[in-house]
């Protein structure tokens, strides 16, 4: 009997506006710009097909499975207001298309191939809805916000951090000295920069040893628990886990990973190790702007944030709204909520296309970092709230009197702003005066 081969319009199979989404479906919102002459329905169906079961023609093995059960479906298309030939395509994927507990497989399927499709001029993944049936198969953050606060014995305020500068070139001993000065001045954390791994001028083992000495010395002086994000990122997973194990042996409370350059498989492996061994895990998003900065092509950071929450991390950098790096306030607060909260309602004004229910998955602390200083403290305290890490690099180390006075200035400003907020004062209007009063 045979079958009819040849090129076939995707919309005949994969555009299904009558489809009612299931609670177990993974839902995606794509911003797509079709090539001239390509109908929106065909473009949306092509996205659904190429990111699930489809290819450009009918193949005889289609008859050996149930396409209706496994195919992705473009179930809605809406034009983007104010944009010519740009649409939001909504696609539903059956849960059985994806391996449990694997962000790697999730992204390989949904964004691995379709972005090079010739029928599309541009394509951007704006949001994903992860159903509880799938999110419950992931490790999630190794510890989460509440457990971290309990480990550190620090409550009722944001945590303070600092990235050690210059990021490259210091010897291990001088690096440890810079860490000590910041921590004794009142910071909770210091941090390896994302590209500090194990270079000729400072091998990782030497850095870990001198930083551990700085941690214990500053803890003894201040009576507070201190931490330094020891970057365990390495060229292999085995080496990464070896570095994390050495940090644990030294008694360090937290390690760090560059999750996009290191990869989701490595990140999830490290998250399991951290949970099993009592280490907190700080996540840096190096390389994110390559993926998320273009407004019409790539992937929005809220998707990368959701992926990180599933893959595993206790902190992640999330922009500042007020600093040197790009970030719109409402959109930034939208993905901050997606990192911290259990249940987040759909809110298109904040870029949230789907209601997201994380059930019991622990939250991730957003880290505000990049071009911020002490005079941003009132705005940061108001924008990010208590469950956050405010990280000042140059804003600490750039103090004319040195690292420790820079750390003192940040701690004094933070405590002044938190107290004023708790007393009901208006930080937006009185913030600078509040800091001046406290610093006299």
From Swiss-Prot:
One GO MF term: monooxygenase activity
Keywords: Calvin cycle, Carbon dioxide fixation, Chloroplast, Disulfide bond, Lyase, Magnesium, Metal-binding, Methylation, Monooxygenase, Oxidoreductase, Photorespiration, Photosynthesis, Plastid
Gene3D superfamilies: Ribulose bisphosphate carboxylase, large subunit, C-terminal domain, RuBisCO large subunit, N-terminal domain
Residues bound to Mg(2+): 191, 193-194
Record-level GO BP terms: photorespiration; reductive pentose-phosphate cycle
The protein's role, per its UniProt record: RuBisCO catalyzes two reactions: the carboxylation of D-ribulose 1,5-bisphosphate, the primary event in carbon dioxide fixation, as well as the oxidative fragmentation of the pentose substrate in the photorespiration process. Both reactions occur simultaneously and in competition at the same active site.
Other remarks in the entry: The basic functional RuBisCO is composed of a large chain homodimer in a 'head-to-tail' conformation. In form I RuBisCO this homodimer is arranged in a barrel-like tetramer with the small subunits forming a tetrameric 'cap' on each end of the 'barrel'.
Protein name: Ribulose bisphosphate carboxylase large chain
Species whose genome carries this gene: Onoclea sensibilis (Sensitive fern)
Gene: rbcL
